[in-house]
């Protein structure tokens, strides 16, 4: 039997419903506020200087800049695999690489900047990571033109300097996921997640398998590698695969568009991607549109949809600037002048 309520009762119920809904909304917004502030707090704990220095300008001037000859040799260099068949020719050392990057000087700079003991311990892990993996990054730069600074900064950020569980378990330092097979996609579409197995996921050489790690979904699988250098090689594949510039997920255009050792105006590229990225040219770096090559490359990654974080490109810039990773890029280019 349908019951009718008086106008007063209806108004009272409506009011209670309104305030209940308002309270729920406040709780959601409050939660988002706390989450965002918690993220900013965590982000601020990273061992990074959030103020850009003139060290890059000084460093570039100290080495006499990068000549047009070096740039031409580097970007037109034939680096087909057979060039590295001999052990002594497997990397940039063949051109007499001399880097000015030093762990001790970086740590001294950060100590002088007022880093706490906790941040200095974290910074020590970061410089140790850079020292251990700079050769892998330089080899990929030599072969495929992706700046070593970009590769290292991404790895530092995405694997917490190799300390994340995923990095320790799989040697996957860039969070590269395995793809769903057609069979796996059917199971996911039917929400039969408990039926998913490792063999339902696809991985690409040099990956040797997959690892179940909860990211967006509990069933996510990530690629696993024999070594960290294989992880760098796989990441470079992703950044240099043939694609159509202007499309989300296409990164290969970045490395030719923003050559090492120069400043670049990101305006034109940012406008091409603006509809997809939602970021205007002047919004990438607080109104600054002409930036060092590594900042332009970081912006290019963000333009093309590499990361969902709104400040991903800025974090990459800060990491490269804080740890002076540009010194590795310049060393390789200077080696091309000989």
Spans of features found by a protein language model:
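Catalytic cores of secreted/periplasmic lytic hydrolases that degrade extracellular macromolecules
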Residues: 2-157, 161-338
């Amino acid at each position: 039997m349908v019951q009718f309520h008086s106008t007063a009762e209806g108004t009272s119920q409506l009011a209670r419903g309104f305030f209940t809904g308002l309270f729920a909304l406040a709780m959601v917004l409050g939660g988002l506020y706390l989450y965002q502030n918690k993220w900013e707090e965590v982000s601020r704990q990273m061992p990074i200087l959030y103020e850009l220095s003139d060290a890059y300008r000084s460093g570039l001037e100290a080495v006499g800049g990068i000549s047009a000859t070096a740039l031409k040799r580097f970007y037109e260099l034939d680096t087909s695999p057979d060039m590295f068949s001999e052990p002594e020719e497997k990397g940039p050392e063949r051109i007499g690489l001399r880097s000015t990057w030093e762990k001790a000087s970086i740590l001294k700079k950060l100590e002088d900047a007022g880093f706490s003991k906790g941040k200095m311990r974290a910074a020590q892990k970061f410089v140790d990571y850079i020292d251990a993996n700079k050769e892998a990054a330089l080899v990929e730069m030599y072969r495929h033109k992706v700046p070593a600074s970009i590769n290292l900064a991404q790895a530092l950020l995405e694997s917490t300097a190799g300390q994340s569980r995923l990095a320790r378990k799989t040697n996957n330092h860039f969070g590269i996921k395995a793809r769903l097979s057609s069979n796996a996609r059917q199971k996911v579409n039917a929400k039969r997640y408990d039926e998913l197995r490792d063999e339902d996921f696809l991985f690409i050489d040099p990956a040797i398998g997959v690892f179940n790690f909860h990211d967006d979904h509990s069933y996510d699988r990530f690629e696993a590698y024999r070594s960290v250098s294989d992880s760098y090689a796989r990441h470079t594949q992703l950044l240099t695969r043939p694609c159509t510039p202007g499309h989300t997920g296409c990164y290969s255009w970045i490395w030719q568009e923003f050559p090492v050792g120069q400043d670049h105006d990101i305006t034109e590229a940012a406008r091409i991607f603006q509809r997809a990225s939602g970021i205007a040219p002047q919004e990438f770096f607080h109104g600054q549109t002409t930036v060092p090559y590594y900042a332009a490359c970081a912006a290019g990654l963000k333009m093309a949809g590499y990361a969902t974080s709104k400040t991903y490109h800025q974090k990459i810039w800060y990491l490269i600037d804080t740890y002076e990773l540009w010194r590795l890029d310049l060393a390789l280019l200077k080696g091309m002048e000989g």
